[in-house]
Design a protein with these regions (language model features):
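Active-site-adjacent core segments of small-molecule enzymes
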Residues: 22-329
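Gram-negative bacterial Sec-dependent N-terminal signal peptides
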Residues: 1-21
Length: 329
């Protein structure tokens, strides 16, 4: 895939550049770089600006209680507010843009506890560290002299950041979906499930659409209406529920915990962990999901984060963007 798609894809799932060692970026620096890359749109998200709100429920599989005491897997019906999104900060980007898609879920657990899942439709992230992510954004900044990214800076980024390669390879081989109902979503990061005996298990998860994964052809990408994904999901949920199966991959102690650019071995055990059912879809302006900050570190008892530096960095970055939205900036 070309370097612009790679850089925007990475920006779009979370920004001049030099290849020497640098101090780790702050959350404010990353948000400012996102603004410089895509412009400032007051009151809106700095990344994943385009989205649609959804509502429904989740029913977890009781068998998962062997691994976690989380109320998500009690077998009860858990109310869900969610948001599908298109990665990037351009409010005019068409839905056929070859960027990652996001699915953020807020689960309302018994006792008024809240738990968030914040997923992407790619199995790996485009950076192992916040520095790589930041450098990717900077490498795609427009050169003032040309109004376009500098090819030499982009080339330098690719040559000096091998952790960006797995996402680039995946994006090059996979077109956008025909429908939000036909996308699978990945946890990206590794998490810890903690059971009633305080035993910890490493896990990743994957939401698989009941109707299967279906992608646009190259020809279709050039003919689809700008907001076809939103329109399609609204129409589908009016006709009936749309579902995903949550598949849980059970890790081993030797598996990578802190690098979201590395795949786990394909032979790891996978079990069904629950079913997500969506029954409504609404344009996001003024809807329930619009003001939610889907911080992936908002977790209830029984699930905990790893020390993945990207996962840990997402929380302050989301907060910095959220504050700007709340203040109308």
């Amino acid at each position: 895939m070309n370097s612009k798609i790679l850089s925007v894809a990475m920006a779009a799932v979370f920004c001049t550049f030099n290849a020497t060692a640098q101090q780790a970026p702050t959350a404010d620096q990353v948000v400012s770089a996102l603004e410089k890359l895509s412009g400032v749109h007051p009151g809106e998200r700095r990344n994943h600006i385009l989205g649609i709100c959804v509502g429904g429920s989740f029913v977890g599989t009781k068998d998962v209680q062997a691994f976690t005491r989380s109320a998500l897997f009690s077998g009860a019906t858990i109310p869900v507010i969610g948001r599908f999104s298109l990665a990037g900060g351009n409010p005019k980007a068409p839905d056929a843009t070859k960027n990652p898609r996001g699915l953020a879920l807020q689960f309302k657990l018994p006792g008024n506890s809240i738990h968030h899942f914040t997923m992407l439709n790619v199995p790996v992230f485009g950076a192992a560290t916040p520095q790589t992510f930041y450098n990717a954004l900077l490498s795609n900044m427009a050169d003032p002299a040309t109004g376009k990214p500098d090819p030499e800076k982009q080339k330098q980024f690719r040559e000096t950041h091998p952790d960006a390669k797995p996402l680039g390879e995946f994006m090059a081989k996979n077109n956008p979906p025909v429908s939000y109902a036909n996308i699978d979503f990945f946890s990206i990061h590794t998490f810890k499930f903690i059971n009633a005996n305080n035993q910890t298990t490493l896990v990743r998860w994957h939401f698989v659409p009941e109707d299967g994964v279906k992608r646009l052809t190259d020809a279709e990408m050039g003919t689809m209406p700008a907001r076809f994904l939103d329109d399609d999901l609204i129409a589908k949920t009016k006709k009936g529920p749309v579902r995903w199966n949550m598949m849980l991959t059970i890790g081993q102690d030797s598996d990578v915990q802190t690098n979201p650019t590395i795949y786990w071995p394909a032979e790891r055990k996978t079990i069904q962990a629950g079913v997500l059912t969506l029954t409504s879809a609404t344009l996001q302006k003024g809807a329930d999901c619009e003001k939610i900050n889907f911080d992936p570190l908002v977790m209830a008892d029984g699930i905990a984060p790893t020390d993945d530096p990207i996962l840990q960095f997402r929380s302050p970055s989301y907060a910095a963007s959220f504050v700007k939205r709340l203040t109308g900036n």
